[in-house]
Amino acid sequence: PSRKGFGYGVNGGMTRYAKVAARLLHKIPDNISFDYAAMTEPCAVAYSATIAPGFVRPGDRIVVYGPGPIGVLCAAMAKLAGAEVALVGLEKDKTRLEIAKSYGCEVIIGDASTWAKSVDGLGADGVVDAAGVSASLKNALSVIRPNGWISKVGWGPQPLDFSLDPLVAKNVTLRGSFSHNWPMWERVLRLLESGKLDLKPVLGGVFPIKDWQVAFEKMQSGEILKSVIRPE
């Protein structure tokens, strides 16, 4: 709970200069632009929630709740690991769900039970909750198979209004995922360098710093997933 990071507990990177310990720096490969390098952080969050635990196996069926930037990137990471992935959202999320299709994901509006249980009737092998609302965790417990896993990366202030008994009855592993570490950034940079992880669908625009408010509003409205702000 006391862990700090740039932009969380200490000042972030939206400044002309930043003082950083040399041991925290990463060398950007020559074939990665600064625009894409700036996207390493959310990619590392998704890597931490999806790949780092070692749960995902080729051929697994994974459900991801929440088609925001982290949810889409979690889905992309699970696809890279060889899983079949469905990203779940609401009617208002159609634009973001379309972006997920470019990563080869199934997209679902509403109930994911049919897709999750379509193979053997038992449910999904794993669920990533990137929505951070009480309902998404409740749905995750509904679609997960016995001995499956749930990775909760989404934050939310709402108290749980349902029983956790299904977690016990199904012997489900529930894992919280917060932030990332230095080696994860290095792995993400290698994925970008090799071209295995394509960020074109996620990066919706590059804006001069004077248009920072436009960049944030476009993300907030769901028009784009992520934006990059360049200093002038």
Predicted regions and their residues:
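Glycine-rich phosphate/adenylate-binding loop and adjacent beta-alpha elements
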Residues: 1-25
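Glycine/charged-rich beta-loop-alpha catalytic/anionic-binding loops adjacent to active sites
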Residues: 24-35, 122, 170-171
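Mid-domain Rossmann-like dinucleotide-binding core that forms the NAD(H)/NADP(H) cofactor-binding site
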Residues: 32-115
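Glycine-rich cofactor phosphate-binding loops and adjacent beta1-alpha1 units
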Residues: 54-58, 86, 98, 102-173
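Residues in the short beta-alpha loop(s) of Rossmann-like NAD(P)-binding domains
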Residues: 89-93, 156, 180
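C-terminal hydrophobic helical "lid"/dimerization subdomain
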Residues: 138-142, 182-232
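Short strand-turn motif at the edge of the Rossmann-like AdoMet-binding core
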Residues: 153-157, 177-179, 203, 207
